[in-house]
């Protein structure tokens, strides 16, 4: 039943009872005290009826948040967590300062004896090897490039001829195929140039050093394009330093299979196309396309142009006046020195 219907029924009952009570009071046969039901409370002449609870109302609007309370005291420290994974390595720091030198270590055991060294990578040895003759006396018998020590401070790589005329010759000039340009300047002849496997000029500074202590014999070998070989040998050979313009000092002609064409250059300075030290009004090096101890100008021109035998130009090839003359250029030429010996073998 709806609440309002129940209330209406109670109201009608109440009205009916009120009518009955009124009748008892005015003209009824019995005048008695009014009686109320257990649910009713009688106050004076009114009856107050108690109805059932109504439906709950809609919730009100939430109130405003209160102000923030004070910060509480720190709680007790928790247990340590598990170890995390290793991180990525950081960037390397700057290089530190160089540390102090360590103490000298103990001396090691003596090593095994090495193989014989004959090439240009040989280290210094206790054996005094000043020239190719010293190498020959210490058992080196093969032609090739060796390291010698004219002085302890000046090791030098040189080509040694260990076969010709008893061996022990140090070659400072070689021509054989025209693969190297010999028409070069003063600085090139000073320092040296060329290829070990073919043609080269050792260098005037080195030639001066090699000939400045002890008497050196000189041998010149030539070969023409017909295969004929000739040579000339001189008792001594040396050149001055650069301040002396590499002045030539050559001794007497000893022997050979070709006549002398070199001693006439004795006492003359070295000339190149850019350094004219000859006695000619012109520049002999430029005229005859070489570099040499020219006077006015030459009887030998072993640093001239490389022609294959006969040539039309006058005296600008590898010429030897007393040999094939000024219009023939030799196929092969070399100049070499060796310490003077008491006895000489000719070949």
Curated annotation (Swiss-Prot):
Post-translational modification: Hydroxylated.
GO terms classed as biological process: complement activation, lectin pathway
GO CC annotation, single: extracellular space
Domain Fibrinogen C-terminal intervals: 121-341
SUPFAM superfamilies: Fibrinogen C-terminal domain-like
Recorded GO MF terms: antigen binding; carbohydrate derivative binding; signaling receptor binding; toxin activity
Tissues in which the protein is found: Expressed by the venom duct.
Cross-referenced PROSITE patterns: FIBRINOGEN_C_1, FIBRINOGEN_C_2
Disulfide bonds: 132-160, 284-297
Subcellular location: Secreted
Coiled-coil segments: none
Disordered: annotated span: 62-115
Basic and acidic residues: compositionally biased ranges: 95-115
Signal sequence coordinates: 1-19
Collagen-like domain boundaries: 57-114
Major localization class: secreted
Keyword terms: Complement system impairing toxin, Disulfide bond, Hemostasis impairing toxin, Hydroxylation, Secreted, Signal, Toxin
InterPro entries: Collagen, Fibrinogen-like_C, Fibrinogen_a/b/g_C_1, Fibrinogen_a/b/g_C_dom, Fibrinogen_C-term_domain, Fibrinogen_CS
Primary role: Initiates complement activation and/or interferes in platelet aggregation and/or blood coagulation.
Stated family: Belongs to the ficolin lectin family. Veficolin subfamily.
Protein name as it appears in the record: Ryncolin-3
């Amino acid at each position: 039943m709806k609440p309002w219907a129940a209330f209406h029924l109670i109201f009608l009952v109440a009205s009916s009872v009120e009518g009955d009570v009124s009748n008892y009071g005015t003209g009824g046969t019995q005048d008695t005290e009014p009686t109320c039901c257990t649910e009713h409370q009688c106050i004076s002449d009114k009856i107050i009826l108690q109805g059932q609870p109504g439906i709950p109302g809609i919730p009100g609007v939430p109130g405003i948040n209160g102000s923030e309370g004070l910060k509480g005291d720190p709680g007790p420290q928790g247990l340590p967590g598990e170890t995390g994974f290793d991180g990525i390595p950081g960037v390397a720091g700057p290089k530190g300062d160089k540390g102090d030198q360590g103490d000298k270590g103990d001396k090691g055991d003596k090593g095994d004896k090495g193989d014989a060294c004959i090439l240009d990578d040989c280290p210094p040895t206790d054996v005094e090897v000043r020239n190719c003759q010293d190498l020959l006396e210490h058992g080196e018998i093969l032609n090739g490039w060796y390291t010698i020590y004219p002085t302890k401070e000046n090791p030098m790589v040189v080509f040694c001829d260990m076969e010709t005329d008893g061996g022990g010759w140090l070659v400072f000039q070689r021509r054989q195929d025209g693969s190297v340009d010999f028409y070069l300047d003063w600085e090139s002849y000073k320092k040296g140039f060329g290829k070990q496997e073919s043609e080269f000029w050792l260098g005037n500074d080195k030639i001066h050093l090699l000939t400045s202590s002890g008497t050196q014999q000189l041998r010149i070998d030539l070969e023409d394009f017909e295969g004929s070989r000739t040579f000339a040998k001189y008792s001594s050979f040396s050149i001055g330093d650069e301040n002396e313009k590499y002045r030539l000092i050559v001794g007497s002609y000893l022997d050979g299979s070709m006549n002398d064409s070199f001693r006439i250059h004795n006492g003359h300075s070295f000339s190149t196309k850019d350094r004219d030290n000859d006695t000619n009004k012109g520049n002999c090096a430029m005229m005859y396309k070489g570099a040499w101890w020219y006077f006015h100008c030459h009887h030998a021109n072993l640093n001239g142009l490389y022609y294959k035998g006969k040539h039309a130009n006058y005296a600008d090839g590898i010429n030897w006046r007393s040999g094939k003359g000024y219009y023939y250029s030799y196929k092969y030429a070399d100049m070499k020195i060796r310490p003077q010996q008491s006895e000489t073998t000719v070949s």
